[in-house]
């Protein structure tokens, strides 16, 4: 009697498994679920077999739960692998900005859409949090460091979970090396840029980024955004270490007239005194016009830089 009942249960179980294996899933439903979730066709098919094509919501829920378990497990397994590739991002909105460095194992993953989407997700979350950050008065940028666990996406999901899901999906170790937010002093606007240029105009990404706090007293011959973009390029290319003092380096004929042998009736002479090894931003020769200092170029456009940030992938924190 016992053997017979056991045989019946085994037969019943085998029948259900066979029915599930033979259950057909339409190509359209499979494509829809794959596009909606981004998970593999194999797992999408499992979800559709389990819940049917008419219950997409539960299929999606099941996939996400399965992916979360797989992601945490894979994240733990891959956690010791070196992450020497990746991207740095900068996103700004008037007086607030966020800078995020996300690393991975290979350049192939760093160039993928999924990796850039993850970086954008973290960046926007940090920017959103920074807008509610209270600040004290001051003439410089105020910096805030965020832990990934303090951030959530638009759906309220913790960013640590989002990162683990991405690790499970992409199959590489990834690490968030920095999440920083900045608030600018009153009357200044934040602008960012990257190199090589990746991401989008609204959210630049690259191996290098720069962020500049710009104040413009009146409209110049070019827009604030264009001017800030030029200064950001200079910061990335010339690697200034400090802001420095605003000093005019050009000396006109009047400054030279007292020198012995100088003819005061001669044409005006302009002499520049710019040190090529200068590390202070405002005293550096402006990259796009080396005959002027950065300060002089800004002054010609009725603008000034209050503060700046430069970050290189894998650089110092």
UniProtKB/Swiss-Prot annotation:
Q: Which UniProt keywords apply?
A: Elongation factor, Mitochondrion, Protein biosynthesis
Tell me the function of this protein. Associates with the EF-Tu.GDP complex and induces the exchange of GDP to GTP. It remains bound to the aminoacyl-tRNA.EF-Tu.GTP complex up to the GTP hydrolysis stage on the ribosome.
Q: Which SUPFAM superfamilies match?
A: Elongation factor Ts (EF-Ts), dimerisation domain, UBA-like
The name of this protein is Elongation factor Ts, mitochondrial
Q: Which Gene3D superfamilies match?
A: DNA helicase RuvA subunit, C-terminal domain (1.10.8.10), Elongation factor Ts, dimerisation domain (3.30.479.20)
| Region Disordered, annotated ranges | 248-268
The record's Gene Ontology biological-process terms are: mitochondrial translational elongation
């Amino acid at each position: 009697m016992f053997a017979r009942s056991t045989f019946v249960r085994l037969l019943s179980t085998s029948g259900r498994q066979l029915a599930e294996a033979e259950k057909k899933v339409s190509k359209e439903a499979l494509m829809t679920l794959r596009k909606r979730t981004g998970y593999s066709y194999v797992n999408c098919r499992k979800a559709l077999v389990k819940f049917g094509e008419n219950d997409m919501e539960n299929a999606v829920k099941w996939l996400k739960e399965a992916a979360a378990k797989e992601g945490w497990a894979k994240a733990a397994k891959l956690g010791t692998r070196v992450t020497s590739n990746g991207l740095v991002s900068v996103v700004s909105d008037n007086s607030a900005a966020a800078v995020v460095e996300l690393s991975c194992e290979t350049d192939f993953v760093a160039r993928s859409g999924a990796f850039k989407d993850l970086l954008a997700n973290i960046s926007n979350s940090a920017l959103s949090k920074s807008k509610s950050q209270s600040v004290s008065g001051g003439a410089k940028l105020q910096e805030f460091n965020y832990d990934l666990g303090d951030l959530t996406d638009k759906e309220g999901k913790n960013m640590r979970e989002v990162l683990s899901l991405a690790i499970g999906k992409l199959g590489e170790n990834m690490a968030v090396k920095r999440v920083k937010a900045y608030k600018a002093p009153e009357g200044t606007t934040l602008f960012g840029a990257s190199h090589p240029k990746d991401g989008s105009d609204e959210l630049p990404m690259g191996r290098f980024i720069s962020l500049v706090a710009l104040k413009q007293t009146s409209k110049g011959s070019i827009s604030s955004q264009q001017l800030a973009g030029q200064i950001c390029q200079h910061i990335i290319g010339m690697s200034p270490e400090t802001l420095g003092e605003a000093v005019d380096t050009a000396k006109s004929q009047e400054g030279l007239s007292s020198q012995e042998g100088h003819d005061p009736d001669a044409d005006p002479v302009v002499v520049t005194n710019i040190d090529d090894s200068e590390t202070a931003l405002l005293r550096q020769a402006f990259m796009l016009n080396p005959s002027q200092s950065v300060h002089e170029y800004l002054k010609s456009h009725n603008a000034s830089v209050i503060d700046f940030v430069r970050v290189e992938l894998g650089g110092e924190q």
